[in-house]
Regions:
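N-terminal targeting leaders for non-cytosolic proteins
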Residues: 1-133
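Conserved long hydrophobic alpha-helices within structured protein cores
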Residues: 142-161, 196-202
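Short coil-to-beta strand junction motifs in C2/discoidin
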Residues: 164-185
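Extracellular beta-strand-rich recognition modules
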Residues: 2, 150-157, 239-247
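Short connector loops at helix/strand junctions that flank enzyme active sites
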Residues: 98, 119, 148-150, 180-182
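Extracellular and analogous surface-interaction loops
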Residues: 124-149, 170-171, 231-236
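Short catalytic/ligand-binding loop motif for oxyanion handling, primarily in non-cytosolic enzymes
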Residues: 10-11, 158-164, 249-252
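Terminal, low-complexity interaction segments
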Residues: 180-272
Length: 272
């Protein structure tokens, strides 16, 4: 769980001003939370993505939450359905087993990631105590991969995503119910080079499409509360898991539904 996370790597407010260089006041979260798994030599890391800023002059590489990644949070504002509340979970008690949880943000599709690198997805790394970090400026982060089996994780919708699915906003085509739409999170196993292994686990966060009732386990509803997801389908030897999203409400520029989910209580068996 995330109950022992130091305050220095947690979201400072429900927006997460300290997740961005311009508003962090010198206390920006970058490499994120990393913690040892039991008494093993394997650590699990939840960083913010370090990527090229394609639309910024000079195209520098920077840690910024808009690149995708994780925000460790304990905020649970249930009424504000916009990006200023992106670090809130739609659950009155915060996390699943305690107050804290992680918000995964970002997605990969043919528009923003034509090479299927999953570079804009939040990624969970199994690694050593050093973790994945910048070794050479303006190049992808590097680290030592460790391996294990991801058994399960608990997930919950964020307030922002839940309320946009429920009510729509200026970016969507209305509520998901009016569209008879759907939205799901996709856990993708990656190898040590960052390439997908071909193993994925899908979990629907909302469904109003009758043709997907059976596969989603949902009929005309948005998922509420914390729910456990079986991740064993990712395989027995995984070093990195990308968290991606797919949905029916999309345009030529990608998803219209906010690409967030809260996670907690990840169960991993390390290969040592």
């Amino acid at each position: 769980d995330f109950d022992n996370v130091p305050s220095s790597v947690m979201a400072s407010d429900q927006y997460g001003n300290n997740l961005y260089s311009a508003t962090a006041n010198g206390k920006q979260v970058t490499t994120g939370y990393i913690t040892q798994i039991g008494q093993t030599g394997t650590y699990i890391q939840f960083p913010i993505n370090y990527l090229e800023q394609e639309w910024v002059s000079g195209q520098p590489w920077e840690y910024e939450f808009w690149n995708g990644g994780f925000a460790i949070s304990n905020f649970h504002n249930l009424t504000q359905g916009d990006y200023q509340n992106q670090c809130s979970v739609y659950w009155p008690n915060g996390g699943h087993s305690g107050k804290n949880f992680a918000v995964a943000f970002g997605y990969s599709d043919s528009y923003n990631d034509s090479q299927a690198t999953y570079d804009k997805c939040a990624k969970i790394y199994l690694t050593d105590a050093t973790g994945y970090r910048v070794v050479t400026t303006n190049t992808p982060v590097k680290g030592t991969p460790k391996y294990g089996k991801f058994n399960s994780v608990w997930v919950c919708n964020t307030t922002y995503t839940y309320l946009v699915m429920k009510d729509g906003n200026s970016f969507t085509q209305g509520s998901l119910s009016a569209q008879k739409g759907w939205f799901k999170v996709v856990f993708v196993a990656l190898d040590a080079t960052g390439k997908p292994t071909g193993k994925e686990v899908e979990y629907y966060l909302a469904n109003f499409d009758s043709s997907k009732d059976a596969e989603s386990g949902l009929t005309n509803k948005i998922r509420t509360g914390w729910n456990q997801v079986d991740l064993s389908g990712l395989g027995d030897s995984v070093c990195t898991v990308a968290i991606n999203f797919e949905g029916s409400d999309s345009s030529a520029y990608g998803l219209n539904t906010p690409a967030y989910v809260a996670i907690d209580d990840i169960d991993v068996t390390v290969n040592e």
